[in-house]
From Swiss-Prot:
BP terms from Gene Ontology: translation
Molecular function via GO: structural constituent of ribosome
Family named by the database record: Belongs to the universal ribosomal protein uL29 family.
Name recorded for this polypeptide: Large ribosomal subunit protein uL29
InterPro entries tied to this protein: Ribosomal_uL29 (IPR001854), Ribosomal_uL29_sf (IPR036049)
Keyword match RNA-binding: no
GO cellular component, one term: ribonucleoprotein complex
Keyword Ribosomal protein among UniProt keywords: yes
Record's keyword terms, sorted: Ribonucleoprotein, Ribosomal protein
SUPFAM superfamilies the record matches: Ribosomal protein L29 (L29p) (SSF46561)
Length: 67
């Protein structure tokens, strides 16, 4: 997921995506713990995507405070 694409989405959609990514990250960590995860890079990708979404949400919240 690219930050440019995420910025085009609505805030509500980003919040839903944040919940989805957090659940996916939890599931990937659980699978890794039980040795059922084949591609451990999915954890890293999920963490970074979640961070991108949270960053954009924070930027929007701060922009609303200033306005």
């Amino acid at each position: 997921m690219k930050a440019k694409d995420l910025r085009e989405r609505t805030t509500e959609h980003l919040r839903e995506l944040e919940k989805s990514l957090a659940a996916g990250l939890f599931e990937a960590r659980f699978k890794n713990f039980t040795n059922r995860l084949n591609d451990t890079a999915t954890i890293r990708k999920a963490k970074r995507d979640l961070a991108r979404v949270k960053t954009i949400l924070t930027q929007r919240a701060r922009a609303e405070e200033k306005a």
